[in-house]
């Protein structure tokens, strides 16, 4: 029996997820500096027409409950001077085969010189677009655009499982010598989503607080070793 296509639950448009620019900088004097490259699960701007009236990771109940802030809460226990930046790259997801064009508006993020780059995206790339290019190769180029040869990397697969894209994310992680974190099972679990909290079905299909915490917990299982490698360089 074929598995349900959970990705179809994501009816939140990939376009116009932000009102401002796609780069949200961190402190330049922070150590370690952690860059999250993501999509609406990482950060979605206010969009009242779908009942999303806040600006943080969809669909957490508060900013401090999204996976970025839960991850950083864990990191800062060991590294009080740590800080993070975010690049919201829903644009790249829909244009991954076009090279650096979607990345250039966020070049400031690589100038921040992150110690660690976390790649946590892919859900907005329609499977039918995979024929347009080598997705795994494009993911490697995306990561290295921001981190170059100096950063260490962590890659997750997708919240809503997709075999082809999840395999590409896994292969990209291998090429980058990155830590790989599986979260694709979470998108199959109703309790990990925000059902009943939002009228818009696409928003509600995003991870709720429990899902966000679980994503953060899984990242934090591997992130300390990644940070240690980065700071040892």
Where are these regions (language model features)?
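Conserved SGNH/GDSL esterase-like catalytic core that processes O-acyl groups on lipids
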Residues: 6-35, 43-130
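Soluble non-cytosolic domains of exported or imported proteins
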Residues: 58-66, 129-137, 159-164, 205-213
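Generic structural signal for well-ordered alpha-helices
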Residues: 105-109, 139-144, 166
């Amino acid at each position: 029996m074929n598995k349900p296509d959970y990705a179809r639950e994501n009816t939140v448009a990939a376009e116009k997820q932000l009102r401002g620019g796609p780069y949200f900088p961190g402190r330049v004097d922070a150590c370690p500096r952690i860059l999250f490259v993501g999509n609406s699960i990482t950060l979605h701007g206010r969009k009242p027409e779908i009942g999303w009236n806040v600006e943080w990771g969809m669909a957490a109940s508060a900013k401090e409950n999204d996976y970025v802030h839960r991850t950083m809460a864990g990191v800062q226990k060991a590294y009080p001077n740590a800080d993070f930046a975010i690049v919201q790259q829903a644009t790249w997801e829909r244009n991954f085969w076009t090279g650096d064009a979607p990345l250039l508006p966020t070049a400031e993020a690589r100038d921040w010189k992150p110690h660690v780059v976390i790649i946590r995206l892919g859900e907005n790339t329609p499977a039918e677009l995979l024929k347009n290019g080598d997705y795994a190769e494009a993911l490697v180029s995306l990561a290295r655009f921001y981190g170059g040869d100096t950063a260490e990397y962590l890659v997750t697969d997708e919240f809503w499982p997709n075999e082809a894209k999840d395999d590409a994310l896994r292969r990209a992680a291998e090429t980058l010598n990155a830590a790989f974190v599986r979260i694709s099972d979470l998108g199959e679990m109703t309790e990990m989503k925000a059902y009943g909290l939002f009228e818009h079905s696409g928003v509600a299909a995003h991870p709720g607080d429990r899902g966000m915490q679980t994503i953060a917990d899984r990242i934090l299982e591997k992130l300390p070793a990644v940070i240690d490698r980065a700071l040892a360089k």
